[in-house]
Amino acid sequence: MNCLILWSWKLAVPTITKANINRGVVKLKTINPILNTFITGDCEQVLKEIPSDSIDFVLTSPPYADKRDYGNENSSISPDEYVEWFLPKGREIYRVLKPTGSFILNISDKVVDGFQHLYVFELLLRLCKEVGFHLVRDYIWYNPATPPNVYSRGGYGRTKKSHEYCFWFSKGSDWTFELDPIRKPYSKDMQKYLDGKGK
């Protein structure tokens, strides 16, 4: 399985490394030169060098839309600009995925002017309608670093989020899900219910 994990979106490293693929201009004609290789660089540029239909799985957690300074060039993105910023990367992810490939997007939303901004949901719609992804499932990742809390700002109270989203997209309709690694045995009550001996 060829997996691609895009974690750092814009690093201070200007080109793909592995000794700059033997110090030449990087042009990857096959996936073999990057197997088992740690690659750093601007993810959009790195993706452009990866052959089409060559990756089975992509996992990414792009920067938050909070105008946070990550210490890198062009690293702060506002919620209003987020969808347009991400879509070119989404198109490249779609291109490099095999027809049976999957893509997990870990993303968080943002409250702006007292209301939850809708950029996450707009991004989901556009990734499916414009890029061609299929949304297989959404998952909630509980983040213990941000415990639930209540806070008030400007007279409005609300609970603080303690989760982020993980959206599972597929490129085509023939995707794979391995259930066995996460299965748990049924409880006694559930087994009785399934056997028709309980309510």
Q: Where do the language-model regions lie?
A:
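Core catalytic lobe of class I
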Residues: C3-K199
